A protein has these predicted regions:
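Loop/turn-rich, solvent-exposed surfaces of beta-rich toroidal or solenoidal domains
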Residues: 329-354
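Surface-exposed loop/turn elements that mediate protein-protein interactions on large endomembrane-trafficking
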Residues: 6-11, 16-51, 74-105, 136-165, ...
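Solvent-exposed, non-transmembrane segments of extracytoplasmic/periplasmic domains
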Residues: 70, 100-103, 108, 129
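Active-site-adjacent structural elements in enzyme catalytic domains
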Residues: 121, 130-134, 142-143
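Residue position within the beta-strands of beta-propeller blades
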Residues: 67-71, 126-129, 182-185, 232-235, ...
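Acidic/polar residues in short coil/turn loops that connect beta-strands
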Residues: 62, 86, 121-123, 153, ...
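C-terminal motif of bacterial Sec signal peptides marking the signal peptidase cleavage site
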Residues: 2-4
Length: 393
């Protein structure tokens, strides 16, 4: 169920308005810009998947609308589109009256087995269809992974590259510099281990694929953000090795001792380390090229400007809302909307928690109480120029 509400978190405690679903033509519904020739900021790196990573990108939007992968019960799928201007939820289709169940329809996906996810640039929608675990033993087109590009209205879909039978796209973000996609890939080996993560550059125009660099094999790596013309890479240097003979306390300690490293990674593979911290010291997220983090030792919320290499404390007061309950810490989400950081305020003594949003400009923290007309909680899925797209819990 999709709803719209005013796109300002300061006004987000209003009731949602139910969207109208209509069977209308895509051309009538969508006012979408097609690819432009040249771009003054082509070298600027941007994250074009969900901030939570490509495997969290089955729903993704821009200021005009939101794209969604719909899984059909019998294996196939479709691309759906929610248009904010008309408040309609439709197939991303070139056909008005259709069952949308074959390749003549631009919304149709032959298979979503293994996972089908989206990335979205100013000019194109990208489809990341992943391999299934059994692909190597059952090499069919339905099971094979690929990366495809199509226009914003779903037209002119082209496969840029097909994944190798044992290839896996690492669960991190997808970056784009206007001409190329950047993502991490690894190969599953016969003994169940994986090869080191490799930074892949995929040319949008013709699908030319280039391996930029191989990352340290002893660490786990994730693309988490972008800064100017570089990728922000987070690495876990000593990932916890879990086994059946470890107790619950041993597992907790091993995870807490994991060391996180932040690195700037250029499109030619050059790396510049920025900082390190233990997992139990920070909760972090990235927005507009900055790292925001809750420091668990000082009990403060900081912004680290990667440009000036200077952390600034934005909030260190008691965490309280209208109910006057005192919370001990903030756990930051990877998501941000309307320039606000989304977080969870947690009370350590009894585990009580509440969703909240922090405004870095006013340095204010507010409780999120957005509900539907029947008092169900809602989750923000995407942000438009005037509306949030939300789903009912």
């Amino acid at each position: 169920l999709f709803s719209g509400c005013a796109a300002s978190l300061s006004d987000a405690n209003v009731k949602g308005e139910k969207a109208v679903t209509e069977n209308i033509s895509l051309a009538d519904s969508m006012n979408l810009t097609q690819p432009s020739d040249g771009s003054s900021d082509a070298a600027q790196m941007k994250i074009i998947s969900s901030a939570n990573g490509i495997i969290a990108s089955s729903i993704l939007g821009n200021e005009k609308g939101c794209y969604e992968v719909f899984d059909r019960p019998a294996n196939g799928g479709n691309l759906l589109y929610t248009d904010y201007a008309t408040k309609s939820h439709i197939y991303l289709s070139n056909q008005i009256n259709s069952d949308h169940n074959n390749e003549s329809d631009t919304s149709y996906l032959e298979s979503t087995i293994g996972g089908c996810y989206l990335a979205l640039s100013d000019d194109y929608l990208f489809i990341f269809k992943l391999n299934t675990p059994s692909f190597a033993a059952d090499e069919t087109s339905e099971r094979q992974g690929y990366i495809a590009r199509c226009d914003l209205d779903g037209a002119d879909r082209q496969i840029l590259t097909k994944l190798a039978a044992n290839e896996s796209i690492v669960s991190g973000c997808v970056a784009c510099d206007g001409e190329n996609l950047y993502y991490l890939s690894c190969l599953l080996q016969d003994d169940g281990t994986t090869t080191p993560s490799t930074l892949i550059q995929l040319k949008i125009a013709d699908g030319t694929r280039r391996e930029i660099c191989q990352l340290d094999s002893e660490s786990r790596h994730f693309i988490v953000g972008a800064h100017q013309d570089k990728i922000i890479l987070k690495s876990i240097l000593n990932p916890a090795k879990l086994s059946d003979d470890l107790s619950a306390d041993d597992i907790v300690r091993a995870v807490q001792e994991q060391v996180h490293q932040l690195t700037l990674l250029s499109s030619d593979g050059q790396q510049q380390e920025l900082c390190r911290w233990k997992q139990d010291e920070r909760s972090e997220m990235f927005m507009n090229g900055n790292m925001y983090y809750w420091d668990k030792e000082t009990n403060g919320l900081y912004c680290w400007d990667l440009e000036s290499d200077t952390p600034e404390c934005l909030f260190a007061g008691p965490i309280r809302f209208d109910d006057e309950v005192s919370y001990d810490r903030l756990s930051l989400s990877a998501d941000s909307f309307d320039g606000h950081l989304l977080a969870t305020a947690v009370q350590d003594s009894d585990g009580q928690a509440v969703s909240c949003a922090f405004d870095p400009i006013s340095k204010s923290l507010q409780k999120l109480t957005l509900t539907s007309d029947d008092e169900k909680s809602v989750l923000i899925l995407a942000e438009g120029s005037e509306y949030f797209l939300v789903g009912m819990a």
